[in-house]
Amino acid sequence: MCSSDLGNGLENVVLYLSEGYSGPATLSTTVPVFDQKNCMYTPHVLAMDVGQNFDVKTSDQTTHNIHPLPNPMTGNIPWNQSQPPGAAPVEKSWKAEEVIPVQCNIHPWMHGWFVVVKGPYATTDDSGNYTINNVPPGNYTVTAWQEEYGKQTQKVTVAAGGAGSANFTFKAK
């Protein structure tokens, strides 16, 4: 569970194994989709694995512009692409782990995030709940990232045939 110190569950928190996981990226069998709908990015935060293809599409009847701003030192390359109504989805992937802000240069209120990780991860639902699946037994550091509150970490042990648990409380600003 991820919540604020006011007791509210936090949506759009990305949780991932930042230490202890040495396996491969856990590429999903479904392609993550970042949609431009009602002049908002949906989901607001899109988590994915390093090297995983994802699609950017538009459901709006207006032209949008998708402009991720990765740190060039990571090896991820910024891009800036217009997407008119009815355009085919744009397929992309990222080379390195990073939290990447996304903006629309046409509609300045539109912003979102790509969170690129290696290994098992989860994003909280609207109540702050999450489950990280496919975690082998071992000792890990779980990192929770939220766009306003930043990062927190916790040590977690997953026993053979068992599950680990980590609850995060972020101090409201």
What positions do the PLM features span?
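Short, small-residue-biased leader/transition segments that mark boundaries at the very start
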Residues: 1-3
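Short Pro-Gly-centered beta-turn/loop motif in secreted/extracellular proteins
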Residues: 7-10, 48-50, 94-96, 132-139
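A short, solvent-exposed beta-strand micro-motif common in secreted/extracellular proteins
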Residues: 13-17, 54-58, 106, 138-147
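Extracellular beta-sheet/turn segments enriched in Thr/Pro/Gly and aliphatic residues
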Residues: 19-49, 53-57, 88-92, 158-173
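A short, solvent-exposed loop/turn motif at the edges and junctions
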Residues: 20-22, 29-30, 40-43, 61-80, ...
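Short, surface-exposed beta-strand/beta-hairpin micro-motifs centered on an aromatic residue
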Residues: 79, 89-91, 121, 127-134
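Structured interaction patches on ligand/partner-binding surfaces of diverse proteins
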Residues: 83, 116-124, 149-166, 173
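A structural signal for beta-strand and strand-to-loop patches characteristic of beta-rich domains
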Residues: 99-101, 108-123
